[in-house]
Amino acid sequence: MAGERWRAEGLGEGWAIYVTPRAPIREGRRRLATQNGDGSDAPAYETHPSRHGRREVRFSEEPPEVYGDFEPRAAKERSPGERRTPPEKFRSDSAKEEVRESAYNLRSRQRRQRGPQEAEEMKTRRSTRLEQHSQQAQQQLSPATSGRGLRDAQSLSEDRGEDEPSSQPVTSQTVSKKTVRTPETSVMSEDPISNLCRPPLRSPRPDASIVQHINPFEEGETEDDLESSYSDVTIRIRSRDSVESRDEAAVAAGHHPDSLWGLPHSRGDFTAHENQPSLLPTGCQKNPQEWVEQAVRMRTRMAYNNIQKSDFGNQSPSTSRQQAAVQPPDESSVKIKWWLLILVAALAMGIYWFFHTPVVETTAVQEFQNQMKQLQSKYQSQDEKLWKRGTTFLEKHLNSSLPRPQPAILLLTAAQDAAEVLKCLSEQIADAYSSFRSVRAIRIDGAGKAAQDSDLVKHEVDQELTDGFRNGQNAAVVHRFESLPAGSTLIFYKYCDHENAAFKDVALVLTVLLEEQTLEASLGLKEIEEKVRDFLKVKFTSSDTANSYNHMDPDKLNGLWSRISHLVLPVQPENALKAGSCL
């Protein structure tokens, strides 16, 4: 009758099949192939012209309804007061075997509520079987009896299945032994539930997970079939450091039907990673509560093993990132050390270059100071200003950095009574300045060139100074500067200029002998400077002097004076000095 449902209890597992009748197909149209999901070669039912068309069972999309196979129509229809007739009553033996072989197990209906008396009897039978089974398990000492333990556990589960469905968590159901062990059969004979189930998403958690696949046995299977079905227990452990391809392969093998052919289904087959001990013999002998406790212990042990494995080589990504984060500082520290080494070397070279020349010059200054002290001890009649100002002026020039900004020009003057002292002291001061180089200062006598041509004297003076300075001499003394031809003195623009002097690291000592007989010691340096200036102006610009007008003028003289008058110091006569010899 349309709209009515019937239930067939079969397979001894409490499974029920819901089917929905379909309206008859019109006459003369060939019925489609069976939709039993097993892909068998059974001929499709056809509508005979002499009788009404049979109703066809199709897949229903409603959750409570299940896609059943073809059964006699009398099995589907029943009266409201009649008892439901199991569908197996109308099947032939071959049809029953075919249904069993096709693993046509779909969604199960809810368990029917059992009465208190029936539940008590089931508990009594279960406890009795558990005690018997535990006694038999104690006698199993060798691994060779694992097959027997599997069969005992299978028989225990079979008896329990008659009373109530198995309470163990079943994640997926596989096909029977004949379906699994025959790769040559058609793909359509695979488990329809596996075809309809959506593969679960990959768990993002890195903890190890245990996936168990247990084949529920069916009625009528042989002992080998039960043993083979119970041997399909696989435990897969996915850790954080597992290879991604291996992880995906493990997930695909657990949830896709194509992986059924790749799984080994031999007796006692048990796959476990991380060298976990075999759990099958003891697991089949435990009740559901012990199964849960064992699963918890497994997860704890595998998590600990993953931690140890991460510590001893297969480090986690976080540890790798930390090491990668620590490694760049090591490389940077090496680079910093190299840069520090280069910096220290450059600093050492700079210090050496900076102090090398000053050390040399300091030695030259010390040598000059020693020479000046000796002269001071010899010429005791000289004014203190001469030693103090003269020594400081020349020391400052020696200590100045290279290249020096300008040459050192020292002008010494004296009266007629100190002419010999002026000549000796000027030469000795110039030699003291160049004493570090152990060379003798350049000497030019102006009195011997007084009668010569101005241009010729100019050329000779220029030649002597240039050759001497280029040959390493750094000091020169010009005696009787006032006796040189007026025009020839213009060459000293070249050597005494403040900014554009030809040689700046040299010292020139000029002497001017006044016409006065005695130079008073009470005169100050400013007065002595004015006296020397007036005297040179008279000598170089007087109209009585031949050719002086054509070669020198007051403007040129003022420019020359500004260049040679850096420091003007007086020289006093010495009583100990003998004629013709220096102290």
From Swiss-Prot:
Biological process annotations from GO: nuclear membrane organization; positive regulation of ATP-dependent activity; protein localization to nuclear envelope; protein localization to nucleus
GO molecular function: ATPase activator activity; ATPase binding; cytoskeletal protein binding; lamin binding
Residue positions the entry lists as glycosylated: 399
Residues in compartment: Perinuclear space: 361-583
Name this polypeptide is given: Torsin-1A-interacting protein 1
Role of this protein: Required for nuclear membrane integrity. Induces TOR1A and TOR1B ATPase activity and is required for their location on the nuclear membrane. Binds to A- and B-type lamins. Possible role in membrane attachment and assembly of the nuclear lamina.
Biased composition (Basic and acidic residues): 70-101, 115-132
Ranges annotated as biased composition (Polar residues): 166-188
Cross-link (Glycyl lysine isopeptide (Lys-Gly) (interchain with G-Cter in SUMO2)): 309
Gene3D superfamilies in the cross-refs: 3.40.50.12190
Organism this protein belongs to: Rattus norvegicus (Rat)
Lineage of origin: Eukaryota, Metazoa, Chordata, Craniata, Vertebrata
Coiled coil location: 360-388
